[in-house]
Amino acid sequence: MLKTKELSNLTEWLDKYPLFHSGDEVDEVRHKVGGIFVPHHLRVLGQQQHLSANMNHLQLDNTSVNTLGYGAGVNISCDPFEQFLLIMLPMTGVMHATVEDGVVEAHKNVAALINTSDPLSMKWGENCNQLIIRINKALIARTCETLLGHPVKDDVKFSSALQMAQGNDMYQSIIHLLAT
């Protein structure tokens, strides 16, 4: 499992790159988050819950590293991404993502990988705070072409559930690289 200290170091470091804090207006939060990812529908679950959203965002060449929490249970839905995929790792709480190949329950030991061609519906628990890595599709295609030695004709697709437990060193290495 990814070390808690590494995640803590990464999230503390990302605090230097706030996009917004204490967002409580649904339309404003949806607009700001949609500017980083894609336009989407956002609905707060339960009449007694209110948003207290925050997001940190660091844009790199072909990726971005983000933390996002809504402070309330929310439903989110959007059309397929065309230019990127997302690795979504809850640092606290649980998120259920309904994608093309079923439902992924993401939590600290299982990240959700959202492919570029999947329509998306998510339910975030009220205490769900996530590390979200956005990777441009062109970078993935170039990397695969380099590794395979020939052009990739179709979208590269990955399994939607990434087990972050011991033994899956590749995924941990990617997160570790970003965390250090």
List each model region and its residues:
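Conserved hydrophobic/aromatic beta-strand scaffold that supports enzyme active sites
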Residues: 57, 65-67, 86-87, 111-113, ...
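Glycine- and acidic-residue-biased ligand/ion/polar-headgroup-sensing regions
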Residues: 61-63, 70-75, 80-100, 137
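A short glycine-rich, His/Asp/Glu-containing loop-to-beta-strand
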Residues: 31-33, 50-72
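Alpha-helical bundle regulatory/interaction domains
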Residues: 2-23, 31-44, 48-50, 96-180
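Short, flexible, glycine/charge-rich loop motifs used to bind or transfer phosphoryl groups or to couple energy/partner
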Residues: 55-56, 75-78, 102, 121-122
